[in-house]
Structures are given as C-alpha cells and as structure tokens.
Amino acid sequence: MKKMLLATALALLITGCAQQTFTVQNKQTAVAPKETITHHFFVSGIGQKKTVDAAKICGGAENVVKTETQQTFVNGLLGFITLGIYTPLEARVYCSK
C-alpha cells in the first residue's frame, strides 16, 4: 500500500503545468481574459489542430493584446487518469481596455 501511495505521489509531483503567453501589443490589458476556450484533444493532440480567432473575439486585430494557452493541473490530471487519451488545453484571449 505504501509503495502504491508513493508511486501516485511521485507521479503527481513530476507532472507539471505548462503555459505559453504570446504578447502581441504592449498596451494596457484587461485583468480578466475576454474569452477562455477549452480545447478537447485526444491522444495528446497528435495530428490535431485547434485555432482561436483572437481578432474576431476582440473586434479587430488592433485590439488583441495577448493570448495564452495553458495546461492546468486539472487538465494534466485528466490526461494522467486517461493515460493521455483525453488531454484538454485552455486558451485565453486578452483584449485592450
């Protein structure tokens, strides 16, 4: 039982969250994202592509300040539980004020 608990704790410790931020303009941005979209990938997203039209969300490309993609702890946990079959990823779009 101790070995199983130790293996589970070790697996949770070595998994991590990932976040990529792309700053488009150096303008004042809203604190909260204009829109948060969850993309549903399968088999770690191999051969899959999802896009977000940030210009459409912000009402024009000149209003886009930054975009982020993030694999949260919960997303990583879902991927771990399903052995990588289901691997969600969140995308956020920030617009100028």
Curated annotation (Swiss-Prot):
InterPro entries: Lambda_Bor (IPR010438). It is found in: Cell membrane. It is a lipid-anchor. GO terms for biological process: cellular response to magnesium ion. The keyword Signal applies. A lipid is attached at residue 17 (S-diacylglycerol cysteine). Transmembrane segments: none annotated. Residues 1-16 form the signal peptide. Keywords: Cell membrane, Lipoprotein, Membrane, Palmitate, Signal. GO terms for cellular component: plasma membrane. A lipid is attached at residue 17 (N-palmitoyl cysteine). It comes from the Bacteria. Belongs to the lambda phage bor family. Encoded by the cryptic lambdoid prophage DLP12. This is Prophage lipoprotein Bor homolog.
